[in-house]
């Protein structure tokens, strides 16, 4: 917080050095004058913040009291904890399974831990943990351990085999299935906090929880992840007010057993695909959480957010260099989002809900609107030589400081690096989004080398790469020209003048 205080003092000092005309409300250069796009973006952010506070401070506490009042009757008769592990270090695996098994014992109902793994070493470790915990905590008559061995062909296969293993147990109608990543550590009491909502709300098909992280890597990565999870908490809480979260995070989400054992659901998670107008049909490699989310969304069921239940994820950035690691992660995250985006929009606002549906539409719009500010300033500067560029960067510093303070509604601390990381996420993240949007078929895991072969010959593969680059350049050019015409930084030649030239 000391760093943030120094940032605020520097901001105030620079403000005193700015020309007085920039602070004059009657001046056309008044710093607080917002364009239409800027007002929309900031208004949209404030709306999410307000909805988040309403959900966490007013709506959710009422839900919590109602769930607590149900007592033991609110818990399902059987809980399945499906944990997928592949190429996770031994210490993280130990923490993850220890937390999962202890929660299975602690929840007080019949529980089955299903470990979907590749290496035999993991199986031996998990068995030792299980027997040690059951001997120490008791509950051996209620808690079982099962293994699903797969060939390292990817997380989608691991989940599909795990869901089929759940089906073989013939779970009762009120059972729940929790899907946990191999790097996600459950907080004590998570199951008893969250599972009662299936009983309280019969129309809820799934839920997800809050996340924090332990980052193995450079301090800048730690700050970036912490900031993203704070933003996630606000956005998820806002969407929780509508009963339609925008993703069922793969780190920890829970489903009704009747959904998780539905053959169509399992097939969707195992082999999902889209038909693209230019790229043709291609399967999804990553984004299993988006596939499961879309299935529940299509069924018209609610998906809620449980803000007081938490998992701790162990994060290993794919590169020690911040820029490279962030780029690799953004390509995967944004690709997962955009590949499912169009078909979710196609469901329509009546099925999805008006506010969630518009949020999904906004996922596409925001990659362009977020670039409008820096692009507009650059165009004006190039065409007029105006010192507006200095005003713009001060405005960025000021507004990102304000945005950083709003994150205190989600977390106890913020960092002086957040204003810079927020702007990095906005501008560079939008650049990456536009890149991915025109190359939806490019997919890659950051932890494994699993790939999907599309069966294209060399000529067609090169043609698709070339057309992807072409439409990307065309889209960016249209954006710049359209914005330039709107700002009158670019002028269309007079038609009469062109006729005379001919």
Tell where the protein language model's regions lie, with residue ranges.
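Juxtamembrane amphipathic/hinge helix adjacent to a transmembrane helix
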Residues: 343-347, 444-460
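N-proximal low-complexity "stem/linker" segments adjacent to membrane-targeting elements
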Residues: 1-99
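Perimembrane helix-loop junctions in membrane proteins
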Residues: 48-63, 266-268, 407-410, 436, ...
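Membrane-embedded multi-pass helical conduit in multi-pass membrane proteins
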Residues: 12-42, 362-444, 479-502
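Non-transmembrane catalytic domains and loops of membrane-associated enzymes and transporters
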Residues: 63-352
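Loop-to-transmembrane boundary segments
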Residues: 1-5, 82-84, 89-93, 352-369, ...
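Short hydrophobic helices that act as membrane-entry/anchoring signals
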Residues: 3, 44, 48, 222-229, ...
């Amino acid at each position: 917080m000391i760093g943030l205080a120094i940032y605020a003092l520097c901001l105030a000092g620079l403000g005193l050095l700015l020309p007085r005309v920039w602070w004059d409300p009657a001046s056309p250069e008044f710093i607080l004058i917002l364009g239409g796009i800027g007002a929309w973006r900031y208004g949209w952010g404030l709306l999410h913040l307000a909805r988040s506070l309403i959900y966490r401070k007013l709506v959710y506490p009422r839900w919590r009291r109602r769930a607590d009042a149900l007592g033991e009757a609110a818990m399902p008769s059987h809980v399945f904890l499906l944990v997928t592990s592949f190429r996770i270090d031994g210490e993280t695996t130990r923490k993850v399974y220890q937390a999962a098994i202890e929660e299975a014992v602690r929840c007080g109902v019949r529980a089955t831990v299903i470990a979907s793994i590749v290496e035999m070493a993991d199986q031996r470790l998990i068995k030792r943990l299980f027997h040690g915990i059951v001997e120490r905590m008791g509950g051996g008559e209620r808690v079982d351990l099962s293994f699903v061995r797969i060939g390292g062909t990817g997380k989608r296969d691991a989940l599909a085999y795990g869901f089929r293993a759940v089906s073989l147990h013939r779970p009762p109608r009120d059972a729940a299935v929790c899907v946990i990543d191999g790097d996600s550590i459950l907080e004590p009491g998570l199951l008893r906090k969250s599972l009662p909502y299936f009983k309280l709300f019969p129309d809820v098909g799934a839920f997800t929880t809050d996340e924090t992280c332990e980052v193995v890597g450079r301090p800048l990565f730690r700050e970036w992840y912490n900031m993203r999870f704070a933003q996630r908490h606000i956005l998820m809480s806002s969407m929780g007010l509508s009963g339609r979260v925008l993703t069922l995070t793969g780190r920890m989400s829970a489903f009704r057993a009747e959904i998780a054992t539905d053959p169509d659901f399992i097939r969707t998670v195992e082999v999902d695909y889209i038909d693209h107008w230019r790229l043709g049909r291609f399967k999804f490699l990553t984004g299993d959480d988006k596939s499961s989310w879309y299935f529940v969304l299509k069924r018209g069921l609610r998906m809620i957010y449980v803000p007081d239940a938490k998992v701790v994820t162990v994060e290993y950035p794919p590169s020690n260099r911040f820029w490279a690691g962030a780029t690799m992660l953004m390509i995967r995250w944004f690709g997962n989002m955009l590949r499912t985006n169009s078909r979710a929009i196609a469901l329509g606002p009546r099925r999805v809900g008006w506010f969630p549906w518009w949020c999904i539409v906004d996922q596409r719009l925001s990659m362009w609107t977020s670039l409008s500010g820096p692009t507009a300033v650059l165009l004006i500067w190039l065409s007029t030589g105006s010192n507006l560029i200095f005003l713009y960067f001060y405005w960025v510093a000021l507004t990102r400081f304000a945005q950083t303070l709003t994150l205190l509604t989600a977390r106890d601390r913020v960092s002086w690096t957040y204003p810079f990381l927020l702007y990095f996420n906005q501008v560079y993240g939008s650049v990456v989004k536009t890149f991915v949007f025109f190359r939806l078929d490019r997919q890659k895991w950051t932890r494994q080398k699993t790939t999907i072969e599309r069966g294209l010959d060399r000529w067609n593969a090169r043609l698709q790469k070339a057309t992807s680059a072409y439409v990307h350049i065309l889209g960016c050019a249209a954006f710049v020209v359209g914005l330039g015409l709107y700002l009158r930084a670019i002028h269309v030649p007079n038609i009469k003048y062109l006729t005379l030239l001919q």
